[in-house]
């Protein structure tokens, strides 16, 4: 989980059909865990109501961890004044809701095949990269492919955005599948 804002965790209750009789593993910061326990307290009771999604919360910090042998590297970024995580998995990185990435954290994003990064709109925003800021970050990091995500209604339509980006950069869309190698 990147952070606890509702647009990133609001679907937790909809995970019911995927939990079955086992707790779904979730990896997150301690502060995000505390927020989710407050908001979704019914999921963490000793005897939850039948059918309620249940989770196994795995607290992580800004150090690599492994899931079934796959190395996951948290990348701390700033979402306004809020520190949140993006993630690098192999040569793939997912960064959303970022407004700043420190030089130290950028080092974790070197030599990427695929970068997915937020680009809210043209107009600057205190907590999200604008289109120009996202494009600057893409130029700075030089991934082989980049996808713009977390686009708001002010970003323009998909075909308009496609005409504004250079080769190797695309606006992402809901349901898109992006492949990358380890």
Regions found by a protein language model. Give the residues of each.
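Structured catalytic/translocation cores of nucleotide/phosphate-coupled proteins
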Residues: 3, 10-16, 115, 134-135, ...
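Short, acidic Gly/Pro/Ser/Thr-rich loop/turn segments
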Residues: 34, 81-82, 101, 122-124
């Amino acid at each position: 989980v990147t952070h606890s804002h509702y647009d990133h965790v609001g679907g937790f209750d909809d995970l019911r059909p995927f939990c079955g009789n086992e707790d779904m593993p979730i990896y997150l910061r301690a502060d995000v865990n505390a927020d989710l326990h407050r908001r979704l307290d019914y999921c963490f009771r000793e005897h939850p109501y039948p059918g309620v999604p249940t989770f196994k919360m795995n607290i992580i910090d800004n150090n690599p961890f492994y899931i079934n042998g796959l190395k996951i590297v948290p990348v701390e970024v700033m979402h306004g004044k809020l520190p949140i995580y993006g993630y690098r998995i192999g040569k793939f990185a997912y960064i959303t809701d970022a407004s700043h990435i420190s030089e130290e954290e950028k080092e974790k994003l070197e030599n990427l095949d695929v970068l997915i990064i937020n680009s809210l709109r043209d107009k600057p925003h205190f907590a999200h990269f604008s289109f120009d800021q996202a494009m600057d970050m893409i130029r700075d990091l030089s991934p082989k492919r980049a996808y713009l995500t977390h686009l708001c209604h002010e970003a323009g339509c998909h075909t308009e955005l496609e005409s504004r980006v250079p080769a190797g950069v695309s606006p992402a869309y809901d349901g898109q599948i992006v492949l990358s190698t380890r």
